[in-house]
Amino acid sequence: MSSKQEIMDDQRFRRVSKDPRFWEMPEKERKVKIDKRFRAMFHDKKFKLNYAVDKRGRPISHSTTEDLKRFYDLSDSDSDLSDEESKILSQKKAKQKKKQTKKEAKSIEKPIEEKKKETKKTDQKDSINKHDLNNSERVQKMKNSQKPQKIDSEISPKKDNEEFLQNKKKKRGTTDLSVEALPKGKLRTKDSSTSEMVKSSTMSSSKAKREKQSVVPVIMAKDNDGKMPDEDALEEDSDSASELGSDEESEDEIISDGKTSADEDESEEEDEEEEEDSEEEEEEEEEDESDSGPDLARGKGNVETSSEDEDDLADLFPEEPGFEHAWRELDKDAPRADEITRRLAVCNMDWDRLKAKDLLALFNSFKPKGGVVFSVKIYPSEFGKERMKEEQVQGPVELLSIPEDAPEKDWASREKLRDYQFKRLKYYYAVAECDSPETASKIYEDCDGLEFESSCSFIDLRFIPDDITFDDEPKDVALEVDLTAYKPKYFTSAAMGTSTVEITWDETDHERITTLNRKFKKDELLDMDFQAYLASSSEDEEEVEEAPEGEEGVNIGEDGKTKKSQKDDEEQIAKYRQLLQVIQEKEKKGKENDMEMEIKWVPGLKESAEEMVKNKLEGKDKLTPWEQFLEKKKEKKRLKKKQKALAEEDSEDELPSDVDFNDPYFAEEVKKIGIKKKSMKSAKDSASSEEETDLEKQKAEMALLVMDEEEDSKKHFNYDKIVEHQNLSKKKKKQLMKKKELVEDDFEVNVSDARFQAMYTSHLFNLDPSDPNFKKTKAMEKILEEKARHRERKEELLIQAVERAQQDTGKPTQKQPMDPALSMLIKSVKNKTEQFQARKKQRVK
């Protein structure tokens, strides 16, 4: 306090008391007010939790009630109740303290009382020894007195009753004298002599009573002659024994009064202590119960205790058989060993879905650097072999026990199926072989107990000793996995994943379903056909070699037939291979040539092409386009004149059908015509060589005319309209077609025209499709295609030039290449022929 006052008196810290920034939050604002319904959390044991260690591991003694009191407080309306409760709690604490003090006092008094009891026991033993003699004499007298009574009772029962009453009175007198002889004041004293007397009398009377009860039935059981007595005699004897017992009980009561008077103070104190203990226990039980009544959430207060109702329910609903499944405890019986080996066993997995490649991919992802997993093999277990043999004959045993009329939602049948699925996990086991024990231990540490994807099947790994070998054939083997092409499996185990169990005994293989539903590519289908239908020659040779030697001497005719059939099969296989190779080559060519073109050479065009080449070499093609046009027109006129002349000659040669050749006039005329024909034939024969050359020229000219027929039908066009109509929808085009206003784009560009070659080479005429002024028309598309071809040609020429340069350096004496101008000319001719064919197709349409 003095230090605080010094700090507050210091001028530097005075403003701390006045500045609100340094004030502490008041308790009313710091604590959250709660309703009286939640007051039990301050004192109820359910909400109490003791902390032994703090968050940093240091030992502390702290509880949750302190935290609750720190942050919560009852509202003002419930503060009175909280005061009352605090009083009750204080009372309870005081009682608990009393209990503790009493227990401590009892623990101190116990050794003193034990010493007193030991002294009393020694005194009692002395008194008992004295009275044992008297009791033994009394028992003998009773035996002697009862024997003649049994005989007399058979003759006269009245005498027996009178004698018994007299004996009874005598005994009462003795007991009265013995009690009256003692002074009354001394009964409640604590002297050793009186207490010994009282205790000895009580002990002797109780012992005598026991001896009588044990001896009397034995005496009454048999007569002196060894015969059983009558029922009347037995009844009388039992009455007499009961009367004797009652007399002795009265004596015991008198003695016990003396005893109680002596020990009354001690018994009262003990009773008070017992009552207090019982009250305290009841209070503790009441404390255990929460103030809010039964806590149904924690399972308190909702238990019915009526046994009759339970019996009735048991009669109505008989107990169902219990099923204990090994949830996550399938490896509880596995022995533990410290030895680490390089082989691992994988157990208790869903083997209907998992394959060896899945496990190999998993282990490869967890192996250490430099570690190798050689293989994963799946073997059938002994248990699995036995069960699978049974299932082949009669199916699963669990299914046989389920009735056919059982409903689908029957719990017992469902749990039987679940039990079968759990057993099915043990049908197989996998063996993973690693390069060293270090890789195996690393995989074991990372993967043991791990869930495979989201399948609810957990990996159970175990080390396999080196001396164990596996003779069975593996079900599945995986040596390598392509992790780039591997696709993981997503599934849930039928036994552990869902409440409704799906049996997997007769289930189709999921890989088969996926392969059948998958869309295959052409290459994959061809590979599958090769694998399915074609066998390699090496396999055939092996099969022939494996044939047993004993069968070599079989019928020769049969061997010949088999050889022929084998040859036929081989021939068919060879043909099939050739067909497949041809198909594959065609597909490869189609893939290589992105621009698929078909060039057809029509017979007769070859000659025209040769003439064009000659004209080119002679220099005739150097004419201007206008001059070429005029020459073509002249040639057309010449051809027309020739055709007319031929037609006139044919008309002259023709004669009417009604002409009578017997008439002398017509006969002379016919002779004249024959002479003319002969003269014409002779003239033709003379000029046959010249005509042949002319005919060849005519053919070339006809070809040129056919190519340029459409040039006569040239017309003007509106470029803007063509662009507009090209971008219209189908409906609007149909409307314009009806009105005959649709402008069709019939314009075809002569791409091979030499005047426009700069469009393909110069950057000044480059076409930019991304430009807003660019209009996509048929002509533009052709120009772009031609430009792409020019680029390809340039690349080819460059490659050829490089190859030639290499060849020239290596082989200087090689032929010179063809003139590039000629090669370009040939290419242009080919292009023209293609255009010609395209026009022909349009005409046909």
From Swiss-Prot:
Extent of Low complexity compositional bias: 194-206
Compartment annotation: Nucleus, Nucleolus; Nucleus, Nucleoplasm
Compositionally skewed regions (Basic and acidic residues) per UniProt: 64-73, 102-140, 149-166, 558-567
Modified residues (N-acetylserine): S2
Modified residues (Phosphothreonine): T305
Gene Ontology BP terms: rRNA processing
Region (Disordered): 54-321, 536-570, 634-660, 676-696
InterPro entries: Esf1 (IPR039754), NUC153 (IPR012580), RRM_ESF1 (IPR056750)
Coiled-coil zones: 775-803
Gene Ontology CC terms: nucleolus; nucleoplasm
Top-level taxon of origin: Eukaryota
Modified residues (Phosphoserine): 75, 77, 79, 82, 136, 156, 200, 290, 292, 306-307, 608, 651, 657, 686, 688-689, 729
Keywords: Acetylation, Coiled coil, Nucleus, Phosphoprotein, Transcription, Transcription regulation
Sequence ranges of Acidic residues compositional bias: 231-255, 263-292, 306-318, 538-552, 648-660
First-listed, main subcellular location of the protein, grouped into a coarse class: nucleus
Biased composition (Basic residues): 90-101, 634-644
Summary of subunit composition and partner proteins: Interacts with ABT1. Forms a complex with ABT1 and suppresses the ABT1-induced activation of polymerase II-directed transcription in mammalian cells.
Family classification: Belongs to the ESF1 family.
Job description of the protein: May constitute a novel regulatory system for basal transcription. Negatively regulates ABT1.
Matches recorded under PANTHER family: ESF1 HOMOLOG
The name this protein goes by in its record: ESF1 homolog
Source species of the chain: Mus musculus (Mouse)
Designated gene of the protein: Esf1
